[in-house]
Amino acid sequence: MGNRVCCGGSWSCPSTFQKKKKTGSQTRRTLKPQPQQLQQNLPKGHETTGHTYERVLQQQGSQERSPGLMSEDSNLHYADIQVCSRPHAREVKHVHLENATEYATLRFPQATPRYDSKNGTLV
């Protein structure tokens, strides 16, 4: 259900570091730099988890990103995360009652037809 952010443990995920190149009739795989090599370029005090394209910086305290701040690492992506909870059944019922369409039955008194002798019609 959903996408897995990181492969680990007993999961068997294809490597994201391999890229196929065709040379003649042979297919050869070339490797991109491994995470250990990329981790050496990070500032001290930072840890990474996950694949290179999904790595997340873990640092003590909270981190905020100002809108004008450009990342030095173009592979680093930020995301807004919202935690939502399911409403309880009572809340759902209450909301449904608030938004429900109201119906009314209108009863008009039955008109008694009268005969108009001048025109010869019912009025």
Swiss-Prot record:
Domain of life: Eukaryota
Phosphoserine modified-residue sites: 62
Protein name per its UniProtKB record: Uncharacterized protein C11orf52
Segments of this protein annotated with the region Disordered: 17-74
Phosphothreonine PTM positions: 30
Cited InterPro entries: DUF4578
Bias type Low complexity, positions: 32-43
Keyword check for Cytoplasm: no
Entry GO terms, CC: extracellular exosome
